[in-house]
Amino acid sequence: MTSVKKYIESNKDRFIEELFSLIRIPSISAKHEHKPDMEACAKRWTELLLAAGADKAVVMQTEGNPVVYGEKMVSPEAQTVLVYSHYDVMPAEPFDLWKSRPFEPEIRDGRIWARGADDDKGQAMMQVKGFETALNLDLLKCNVKFIFEGEEEIGSPSLEAFCRTHKELLKADVILVSDTSMVSAETPSLTTGLRGLAYWEIEVTGPNRDLHSGHFGGAVANPINVLCKLMADITDADGRITIPGFYDDVEDVSPAEREMIAQIPFDEAKYKAAIGVDELFGEKGYSTLERNSCRPSFDICGIWGGYMEEGSKTVLPSKAYAKVSCRLVPHQDHGKISKLFEEYIARVAPAYVKVRVTPKHGGQGYVCPIDLPAYKAAEEAVFVAFGKRPLAVRRGGSIPIISTFEQVLGIKTVLMGFGLEQNAIHSPNESCTLDFFYKGIESVAEFYKRPQIRN
């Protein structure tokens, strides 16, 4: 057993309890009533960073939730890694679908079950404990800075300004992020690309009050009916987006990419069974893995209006609402797409309702060059921990701040994540396997043993 494995084995119970201390804080950025929890979680992270060996760790205020900054400087001449993560989590609703309380972590069947077990408290803890392991074994070959934000799940609205203000403080050679997933438990991988994101809220208003559906139905437009028609028309029967100009900057999947994607082990039957669907759906001419990584998509994330309580109430509602998003591919500008969407809705909305579109958060896609020295270091580190050389894969999720880091700080990012699809992030019963938790720590420690990370 290597010294790294021995250190992890000797300290694994403490590592788990420290993670649990974070999970028990419901740091939900989407809900204002959890503002005190955001502050408490940030403070707890400073304590854990200092205990892990950071020279300093402080809570720094922003226009929104605070940022946690920490650092360990081994030498002015050494190269520097900036570790990014987030301490906020998604809301846990619907609670009735959880098999255990979301903020009371449990270990069952070799997994940690709780909100944030994977995204991203679990993966952030892998980073910090990997750093601690390398430091205590005298293996740390580079300076390490940490920046943990509290607004990733709401689009990082305060982080760009923070980065611009503290550009010198955040100076580094590469950014390391653990907030992505691997292909499967049997197939380790490194993420080489992410999709971008554009997100909107839509409000449709008809009459000035809820109306009796018998007295007014058929004579007055129903806002829910109108909203459903507007949203349904955004995609065709195959899921292709119909907004004019939407695909102008979309590059088709290249033959080389298609060949690389085809090498990824993928069992369609297992995929369908895991998510409980009989058939898959999507743009014609593309495989499932191409659709959910290299092609854009449109989704209604929430839609509501009218009477939703127990029993029946025959009303024609005054208002209807939706939250919708587009996943974008590299070269699609989220600002341009947002404008196209707003102009499209304004053009097709009927005169008998008022439609208001409010753009929310968004960001660009990102592609990591696989010839970066830091990528090679991550590849070797994962190989040591998992016993298999990781595949290079593009993923369908979004971390909009990654492209901002490159634009503002001028630093490339390496995405070394340890999640799995079955971990159910953003869903009830989120979890993380203990095996991956420890292998993630080992991978990070192995990464820090490799001094050549400068681009």
Residue positions per predicted region:
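An extended, acidic, His-containing surface patch that forms the Zn2+-binding/catalytic region
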Residues: 51, 184-185, 242-319, 330-343, ...
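Acidic, glycine-rich active-site loops and adjacent beta-strand->loop/helix elements
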Residues: 87-89, 111, 147-156, 178-182, ...
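Flexible glycine/proline-rich, aromatic-decorated loop/lid segments
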Residues: 189-205, 414-416
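A short core secondary-structure module
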Residues: 217-238
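Acidic/histidine-rich catalytic neighborhood of metal-dependent amide-processing enzymes
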Residues: 118-193, 455
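Active-site metal-coordination/substrate-binding segment of hydrolases
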Residues: 78-145, 439
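N-terminal helical capping/dimerization or prosegment-like subdomains
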Residues: 2-95, 319, 336
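A generic structural motif
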Residues: 118, 208-210, 326-333, 363
